[in-house]
Amino acid sequence: MTDNVNNAESWAEHMRSEFVTMDVEQALQTMTAEPCVNHVPTMTGGFGAAAVRQFYRDHFIGQWPSDTTITPISRTTGDDQIVDEMLITFTHDRVIDCILPGVAPTGRKIEIPAVAIVRFEGGKVTREHLYWDQGSVLVQAGLIDPEGLPLAGAEAAAKLKDPTLPSNTLQAKIEAQPVPSSGCLG
């Protein structure tokens, strides 16, 4: 149990350095000598201390809008791993390289259900993999029109916050649309 507590404390300190103190070197002190950060949907991050330092300095720490909130939803812990489910909310008022690389601010509110899988060695972060639905982000940013596509926008975050909201709404939406003919029969 001690490892789980130490890992949770290390992860909390890591998150504080990323989002509260916004201190790259402090973040790296919570990590092993050869860490890996991988934001899977956008393929951003780095491998090794130098690459992670550059990513944090140039593309992550300090780039988040001032209204960013991270709301924990659930946590699963093991001897050397934590899996956190969370809701990340912000107003897209600046370029955020790790979420919407190269996309000019849209001024839109973005709510992202996300999962972080964090592995530890000796009480320090060695692997940090983040997953989220980039389609939902692109819909909320106004970059994709969801009409006719099996994509959710902010509804995905709303459903995470309130499990009593209806499920299967995309299926109903798609089923209500006429299926175009292939023209093969005539």
Model-identified regions with their sequence ranges:
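C-terminal and inter-domain tail/linker signature
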Residues: M1-G186
